[in-house]
């Protein structure tokens, strides 16, 4: 089971902007994920919870509101998805994360 992010880093203007990243499942199992941010005041992530099908991908949009330039990060926790899961947020509470992917975020002036 593996999950990667493409592109692996995010650079957005400190004045605000957005970046789209693709989560790619390189394995044969459906994956469930949850995304945590080191800065919830200036970043919005969509979706926060979700599924990625085997050998599939899922787009994640990172949106930055205006603020001081600084370095932050996203950490994507992932695990094999329960077979009967349809609500990622509810199902994630019942799994133990099997790995993480970190996306460094840089807001530039």
Curated annotation (Swiss-Prot):
Origin species: Caenorhabditis elegans
Ranges where the MSP domain occurs: 2-109
Gene expressing this chain: ssp-9
InterPro entries: Ig-like_fold, MSP_dom, PapD-like_sf, Sperm-specific_class_P
Stored PROSITE patterns: MSP (PS50202)
Protein name (record): Sperm-specific class P protein 9/11
Tissue/organ expression: Expressed at higher level in testis.
């Amino acid at each position: 089971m593996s999950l990667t992010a493409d592109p692996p880093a995010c650079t957005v203007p400190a004045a605000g902007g957005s970046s789209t990243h693709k989560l790619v499942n390189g394995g044969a199992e459906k994956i469930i994920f949850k995304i945590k941010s080191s800065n919830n005041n200036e970043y919005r992530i969509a979706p926060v919870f979700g599924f990625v099908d085997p050998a599939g991908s899922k787009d994640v949009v990172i949106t930055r509101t205006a603020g001081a330039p600084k370095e932050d990060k996203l950490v994507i926790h992932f695990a094999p998805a329960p077979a009967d899961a349809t609500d990622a947020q509810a199902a994630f509470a019942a799994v133990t994360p099997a790995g993480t992917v970190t996306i460094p975020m840089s807001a530039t002036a």
